[in-house]
Design a protein with these regions (language model features):
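Thiol-based oxidoreductase modules, predominantly thioredoxin-like and allied folds used
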Residues: 31-44
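Local sequence-structure signature of Cys/Sec-based thiol-disulfide redox active-site neighborhoods
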Residues: 1-28
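Non-catalytic, surface beta->alpha helical segment in thiol-disulfide oxidoreductase systems
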Residues: 60-89
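Short alpha-helical
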Residues: 13-14, 41, 72
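Hydrophobic beta-strand residues in large extracellular and virion-surface proteins
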Residues: 4-6, 34, 58-60, 81
Length: 89
């Protein structure tokens, strides 16, 4: 599996939903490296990713696959996170 990078912020409800989806989805996929970057605490790492506005944003080998949007439902988040894992295969 390819490396997945997730950019998040502490206290973000959409990030919490993404982590819940990851916990459910990863059971059905081979182990993969998941790098989590907190935008507030690791700005030097987050600034390498210049093509996102909302968090969470998820990348596979540096290519953005998912970016949350305001008002996103858990089902939308789950489907998007699943696409990330599919892209990492």
């Amino acid at each position: 599996m390819k490396k997945i990078t997730m950019i998040k912020m502490e206290g973000c409800p959409y990030c919490a939903a993404a982590f819940q989806a990851i916990d459910e989805i990863k059971k059905n996929y081979p182990p993969t490296e998941l790098e989590v970057i907190d935008e507030n605490f690791q700005p030097q790492l987050a600034e390498k990713f210049t093509d996102y506005y909302y968090v969470p944003s998820m990348y596979v080998d540096g290519k953005k696959i998912y970016e949350a949007h305001p008002g996103e439902s858990y089902d939308e988040c789950f489907a998007s996170v699943k696409k990330v894992f599919e892209a990492a295969r």
